[in-house]
Amino acid sequence: MSFAIFDLDQTLLPYDTQVLFCNFVLKQHPLRRAYLALFGPAAVLKAAHLLSTRALKRVFLSYLRGLSQPELEKLVSAFVEQEVLPALYPELLAEVERQRAAGRTLILNSASPSFYVGAIGSRLGFHHSIGTAVRLTDPMPLFPEIDGPNNKYEAKLIAMRHLMPTELSLPLPGAWAYSDSKADLPLLRFVENPVTIHPDPFLANIAEHEHWPILTPPRPHPTRFAFLKDCTLQALGLFRRP
């Protein structure tokens, strides 16, 4: 059995789906922008290294407070169809289909919340989808619980270990991994065939030195500043996808 493992945000599509989903919800529920009163100070604490990424993610998700499970499921379904699918890189979709045709087990492995990572993975025909395990309750609480770690760095490898052969030979023979992020270096080094997508200078330097493929599909924001501007608008519920 061989594997093809894909990151989600800025890998399959040019956006961070965490703020893109927030934008989608806030445009339909404008009063939920009140979450910013909590998230703003929390972001300052995170910048000062006084709050963990995991805790900040819980505060960020406060915009979901009070939603019932049927309401959240309806939002996720609409988000996948209306925002995610149209934004996917055709070049990366082609890679997904190429790996499927080769008979590889497709794994979507993301730090984004599992409740919509699973929906995206199912819609795209992935065999397995893994995200940060945000606990769903009915209704959603102010600060949703996260079961386990933020699914990033080595946590991604731990989260999919049960899918792998009992005896591992590393790098995993015949396996592929796709990511934009230096945070995914453990994942990229885990496989025989790493592929980077619009890597930052640090990751690009490693990719060039290691002779890893670098994919640069067209994207709507040509600079890091433009990407961060889009993220800010999304966090405010003011972003309109081109």
Residue ranges and their predicted role:
Residues 13, 48, 61-65, 118, ...:
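Amphipathic alpha-helical interaction elements
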Residues 16, 67, 155:
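Conserved active-site and cofactor/substrate-binding residues in soluble primary-metabolism enzymes
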Residues 1, 74, 81-242:
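C-terminal cap/substrate-recognition subdomain and adjoining C-terminal extension
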Residues 1-49:
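Active-site neighborhood of HAD-like aspartate-dependent phosphohydrolases
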Residues 46-65, 236-242:
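Low-complexity, charge- and small-residue-enriched intrinsically disordered regions
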Residues 41-58, 138-146, 160:
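N-terminal-biased segments
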Residues 56-90:
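Metal-dependent phosphoesterase signature
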